[in-house]
Curated annotation (Swiss-Prot):
Gene: hslU
UniProt-recorded name of the protein: ATP-dependent protease ATPase subunit HslU
Molecular function (Gene Ontology), one example: peptidase activity
Keyword presence, Isomerase: no
Subcellular location: Cytoplasm
Protein residues bound to ATP: I18, G60, V61, G62, K63, T64, E65, D246, E311, R383
Ribonucleoprotein in keyword set: no
Amino acid sequence: MTDLTPREIVSELDRFIIGQKEAKRAVAVALRNRWRRKQLADDLRDEVYPKNILMIGPTGVGKTEISRRLARLAKAPFLKVEATKFTEVGYVGRDVDSIIRDLVDAAIVETRARMREDVKARAAKAAEDRVIEAVAGRDAREQTREMFRGKLKRGELDSTVIEIDVADTSNPMQMLDPTGQGQMGMMNLGEIFGKAFGGRTQRRKMTVAESHDILMNEEADKLLDDEVVKATALEAVQQNGIVFIDEIDKVCARSDMRGADVSREGVQRDLLPLIEGTTVSTKYGPVKTDHILFIASGAFHIAKPSDLLPELQGRLPIRVELRALTEEDFVRILSETDNALTLQYKALMQTEKVGITFTEDGIAALASIAAEVNRSVENIGARRLYTVMERVFEELSFHAPDRSGEEVTVDAAYVEKNLGELARSSDLSRYVL
């Protein structure tokens, strides 16, 4: 759990997301409240519930990115889902309880990876011993083993093919799992038979280099207690979990709509207990959702936030509106963020020994075209920059291997040459950009 202050959290988010100050402050306070709750006495701690957030704003303005970066900062189990994937219980499709099961699965993987790091040194030694045994033989003398150990550390054995026994992770009874039911809280037939067939190994040929990760993971897992991994992951989900529900506006039954809105309101009703706090059965054990932070988001172009069920509105007390991005924002996105597209394209072309330099007027031209196409065709926010950049670099990307050693300057003239005609024709840009 992070102990960053709200100001520090916003500062970290500013490195990747331009603007949207109100949304950043809301999620920063929500995350800090997690830390504050941890400092309380036990009896009061259970009474303090997270204030769930509803983000309202057009597509491509940073709603998902804010949540994803927040989860990384928090080092918390995080899951992003689309509300449209789910149906009311009783209809064909996924029910909302699978959100928590997926979150637990993600937490188990995350926790196991973190715990593997803690035993990495011991696992590396055990993996090394297995490789040396495979190369030198089980009965090799200590002197021979040490000679091969030296070669292994120097990388001289990387291309040597060895034959080792590795765990067989396949489950021959997987077909017995009912379709879509593999995540239920009950143990299914496939799992029962899988356990009966568990512990099997299979002999495989591979190079020493290829065996490294496989043996490291196997040896690390031998040093880990599965029950501790499970308990730690469940605790992390219950206390620090973050669920981002996108496209919540798509499950609104609009007030002016008539007819059978199959399971739209039903999905909202099913979400109510999940967000309010309930216990969900998973194959790792029951999970209480009382203290999981839910962030819902939607564009609300057609539906309005007031079209959500009143009870659901009450469970999303913090509302933040994200504004549409302007041309100035696009300039800043291309030049100020740590993961700017300009830096990405520079690095990609550098792999082909082609140097790229972006001028200020070149960046301004890219931003101007993206903003113009958003205005004239469809506003998809910062995602338009991907399309524009890809089109500008299409020719260079194709011929880059033949242009090794060249320096290319991306200025306004270069952008105009590669994109000008397309941007000017609204009919063309509708289909191409």
